[in-house]
Amino acid sequence: MTKRLDADDRCPVRDGLYMPAEWVSHERTWMAWPCRAEPWGSLEGLLRARVNFAAAARALSGFEKVTMVVRPEDHDEARLACGRGISFAVFDIDDSWMRDMAPLFVTDGKEGVAGVHWRFNAWGNKYHPHDNDAALGAQILDALDMRSYEGPMVLEGGSIAVDGLGTLITTEQCLLNENRNPNLTRQQIEERLAIYLGITRVVWLGEGLEDDETDGHVDNIAGFAGPGRVLIHKPPNDGGYNDRVMKDNIARLRAARDARGQPFEIIELPEPGHRDRHDGRRLDMSYINFCFTNFGIVMPAFDDAADADALRVMQGLYPDRRILQVPSLDIVEGGGGLHCITMQQPSGTPLKPERF
């Protein structure tokens, strides 16, 4: 069943809140220590991923506070691996993709910050159990003593990109997928994004990268570089799946307008060379899957010839930001990237919880 917003319902947009862009000032970045071997295919794969997670946490901590969510039984190992400068929050978790488990933070554009925790079903019930991950967003907001709103649909942070000015980019493959919100129409999904994130324009791309088990998360193919500017995963011009999909997505972006009615400036980042995962599916490497930090950017390196090209593009876009590349192959082996394992909390004072 679907629920319409009633006149007396409390929601972020009625409280003057909206989701800001990722490049605004951060209070911290949230991460989660890897604990499920299944995405990496083996315990050895999980252990290699932990090395990459720890390196990413250390890189991020050079710019801002990093809080690592960790299971009680993994706390000592995680602290030893990450070293100084990382704080830890102990929760029961099932997996480590913080972008999709964490709340989406909203702000009043001044000092106040609140959060929206959405329903989570492990990317269409692909992994079990996931009850702890589904509860994590609300638990984080409770631990922060921050006002919390419950988003009335399944939504993962990696499935959307926002510019903080009312524009949101997503994919039809993910948000319209029957394994997410089968009882919601496109219009009803857009209404919920408007009400809970302050979105006034949704730009619908088509599909994501080949063999993406998240069903086309946008954070592997497109993201805002700034107001009116979109970074896009470059079509490889080989006639393959990614080539076809990304040419279609670029055509959609060129035809679209943002919430201000302006066209997008499109900047391409190269596609790394083809590699396969442990299970034979394509390894979805993407330079789009990077993290904004305070005064910097942390982006992936794949031991690929395109690493240097991607870095040059980013340095040209952000001459005033310090840009670090960190090894990410063993993260991507599990199905996600640097952006997928992080969630930014914008700077500000937590709005106090209200009982409604």
Language model features: what each stretch is:
Residues 2-356:
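The feature marks the mature, well-folded catalytic cores of soluble enzymes
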